[in-house]
Design a protein with these regions (language model features):
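Hydrophobic ligand-binding cavity/cleft-lining segments
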Residues: 1-50, 159
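Structural motif
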Residues: 16, 79-81, 104
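Glycine-rich portal/gate segments that line the openings of hydrophobic small-molecule binding cavities
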Residues: 2, 34, 44-96, 109, ...
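Beta-strand/loop substructures that line and gate deep hydrophobic ligand-binding cavities in soluble
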Residues: 86-143
């Protein structure tokens, strides 16, 4: 009666820093709760990857400003760091997130293409009426990530 709901939400971040440092931070999802704690409640590695990290899987417990929590797994399926990598999501969210980084002077440009669907009943029921709210929730979460990433880069630079 209520079909799965799909989302494709691109995000663009601009931070002061080098893409090598950004990629190093973003390639350690188990540290997300420390600097992106408004969204990532816990991230635990459940499977190590190969020498390039391919196959590494993490269990994620996350939230936004809406009153629900998500449990999902992220697996690194492509790795061309520091310029791009792809994570496959399963669980409450199913799909892919593709990170693409480029350097422009002292600015790191980070593009994230999040393309997922959810079979979760809550999303299937609410999406026809409140899709814009759910997209806004994701944008809020990503804005927290951009601010947290900039702060983490500054922290590392001062260390």
């Amino acid at each position: 009666m209520f079909p799965a709901v799909s989302f494709r939400i691109p995000t663009a971040w601009r931070v002061q820093g080098r893409i090598e440092d950004v990629a190093d931070i973003l390639s350690k999802p188990e540290e997300f709760p420390r600097w992106w704690g408004e969204v990532y409640l816990s991230v635990t590695t459940t499977k190590p990857g190969d020498a390039q990290g391919i196959g590494q899987t993490v269990a994620v417990h996350s939230k936004g400003w809406l009153p629900y929590r998500l449990n999902w797994q992220g697996t690194l399926v492509e790795n061309h760091m520091p310029t791009s990598w792809t994570v496959e999501a399963t669980g409450d969210l199913v799909g892919r997130g593709i990170w693409t980084l480029s350097q422009h002077g002292d600015t790191a440009e980070i593009d994230y293409d999040w393309s997922v669907r959810s079979d979760r009943l809550l999303f299937r029921v609410l999406a026809p009426l409140l899709r814009w709210v759910m997209v806004s929730n994701h944008r809020w979460a990503m804005a927290k990530g951009e601010r947290g990433l900039q702060a983490e880069l500054a922290r590392r630079a001062g260390a």
